[in-house]
Regions:
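Substrate-binding cleft of extracellular glycoside hydrolase catalytic domains
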Residues: 81-141, 145-146
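Active-site beta-loop-alpha junctions enriched in small/polar residues
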Residues: 40-44, 67, 104-106, 146-148, ...
Length: 272
């Protein structure tokens, strides 16, 4: 049983009455057959979803950046779908693509921490996510919560554990973005990758940046050796199921400059 504040407990079997088991109707899942080939579609303004026509070669899932947490919003979610976003969803479905919309925490440490540590706020956020999935006929949700307190690791797990069955009962997919295993407390050590991989349908390794914009030395964005070493850690010390691991690669690089003993960089995107 679960109390009103989210704590779990039990009741002795002797104190239970007659138990009736009800078999739910099977719900068709929104998972993809075979390997996941996903493309994030980034846009920030309301109703600014890109117009698309025809299929995307090699892609079977799109993840538009539709949702983000409100700062100090107590579990509320901002959306930027609009008519353009609805047309985008219809285009994707008409071309056989799954839509796993992304929700971001905008790297807001304190806002995220407040929600994760409050059962009522977590439940409010979960209800908002579920309502948006239904409202826009989405096939799943991609959780992109970055820059979190390491101390909130267990409560982030709790959030996912509470969200997953709500999506699963509708046949919807839960995916979670995570960083490389080795790094800072708020960037890397805030994720329990083993538990996340058990709860979510897919865990997405954001294989970037090996050397980011704030680095004090120049280097590659995602070197092959670095990526392979981290995949080995995911499958080894982190205990992630390989069937659930999705590798996200950067379609950008950095041009580095050095002047007066200091380095700076410029981001260069991959062009069509």
């Amino acid at each position: 049983i679960r109390t009103s504040n989210g704590s779990l407990g039990y009741v002795k079997e002797d104190n239970l009455g007659k138990i009736n088991t009800i078999r739910d109707d099977m719900v068709e899942t929104s998972k993809v057959e075979g390997k996941v080939s996903l493309a994030w579609e980034y846009f920030s303004d309301y109703g600014s979803a890109p117009e698309r026509s025809g299929a995307m070669d090699g892609v079977n899932v799109v993840s538009p950046t539709f949702f983000r947490l409100e700062q100090l919003g107590k579990g509320n979610v901002k959306e930027n779908v609009g008519t353009a976003g609805i047309n985008y969803i219809n285009w994707a479905h008409n071309n056989g693509l799954k839509v796993w919309a992304m929700i971001s925490n905008e790297s807001m440490l304190d806002t995220t921490s407040e929600i994760m540590n409050d059962y009522k706020l977590r439940n409010k956020l979960i209800n908002n996510i579920v309502n948006l999935v239904v409202k826009y006929n989405l096939d799943g949700i991609n959780i992109d919560f970055e820059n979190m307190y390491m101390e909130d690791k267990a409560m982030f797990n709790r959030f996912l554990i509470e969200l997953e069955p709500r999506l699963n009962e509708m046949g919807k997919v839960l995916t979670v973005d995570v960083t490389a295993p080795d790094g800072s407390e708020t960037w890397s050590m805030c994720f329990d990758r083993n538990t996340i991989s058990k709860v979510a349908d897919y865990i997405i390794f954001m294989a970037y940046d090996q050397y980011g914009a704030s680095s004090n030395k120049e280097g590659t964005t995602a070197g092959c050796d670095w990526v392979e070493a981290n995949i080995t850690k995911f499958l080894g010390q982190e205990g992630v199921n390989p069937d659930k691991l999705v590798l996200a690669v950067p379609f950008y690089t950095r041009l580095w400059k050095e002047a007066n003993g200091k380095v700076s960089s410029e981001t260069v995107d991959l062009k069509d």
